[in-house]
Swiss-Prot record:
Residues that coordinate or bind Mn(2+): H112, H114, E119, H158
Signal peptide positions (record): 1-27
Stored SMART domains: Cupin_1
Protein name: Germin-like protein subfamily T member 1
Organism ancestry: Eukaryota, Viridiplantae, Streptophyta, Embryophyta, Tracheophyta
Source superkingdom: Eukaryota
Glycosylated residue positions: N136
Main localization, broad class: secreted
Source organism of this protein record: Arabidopsis thaliana (Mouse-ear cress)
Length: 220
């Protein structure tokens, strides 16, 4: 039986494409090329974060913003205090960040997604209903109590809801120094410039009055 022979040039091309496109996709942020690179936030960001500060100290690797309490007196009853490269420059190029999330009783961190990172959240206080949606519209959810954790795959829509009678607090961690957040309600109904009403009425199978009412709630 004849054996299929793959031309060596074609094989080399395939291996090159694999190295260029598949291997980098296994990580989120790029790997650092030095021990650390404390971000100079006064400079413009580049592809892999901020340029390095010329002089650093222990204070650059310290952050005190993960404590509480936070003010949750807003329509959603939630406040998120991020510890990412923009607030904690020592994280620059290290591929990690955290959030301090506090929810009032009944408070909701509305459906959102992080385009650049996987998230793992741990409840510190209270009881939080956490859920994410897969690409086939399946809801995966769990009520978390103190000391319990839940992972949210990268780029999937998810939310947190305080189902307890007292405040709840979570610490969330990401495999990116700046995971980004697309909050669906404010993105769809509070964008600048606005998404045309005709698009939203058709997408949500509703009428122009309802869409305009929703837009008014997210107008800045």
């Amino acid at each position: 039986m004849a054996t299929l022979q793959i031309p060596s040039a074609l094989l080399r091309s395939f291996l090159l494409m694999f190295c260029l496109f598949v291997i980098p996709s296994l990580s989120s942020d790029s790997d650092p090329l030095q021990d650390f690179c404390v971000g100079d936030l006064k400079a413009s960001a580049s592809i892999n974060g901020f340029p390095c500060k010329s002089a650093v100290s222990a204070s650059d690797f310290f952050y005190s913003g993960l404590g509480g309490p936070l003010d949750t007196s807003n329509p959603n009853g939630v406040t998120v205090a991020p510890a990412n490269v923009l607030t904690f420059p020592g994280l620059n190029t290290l591929g990690i960040s955290m959030n301090n999330v506090e929810l009032a009783p009944g408070g909701v961190n509305p459906p959102h997604l992080h385009p650049r990172a996987t998230e793992v959240g741990t409840v510190i206080e209270g009881s939080v209903f956490v859920g994410f949606l897969s690409t086939n519209n399946t809801l995966f959810s769990k009520v978390l109590n103190a000391g319990e954790a839940f992972v949210i795959p990268r780029g999937l829509v998810h939310f947190q809801w305080n189902v307890g009678q007292v405040k709840a607090r979570m610490i969330t961690a990401f495999n990116s120094q700046l995971p980004g957040a697309v909050v669906l309600p404010s993105t769809l109904f509070g964008s600048k410039p606005e998404i045309p009403n005709a698009v939203l009425t058709r997408a949500f199978r509703t009428d122009d009055t309802t869409v305009q009412n929703l837009k008014s709630k997210f107008a800045v």
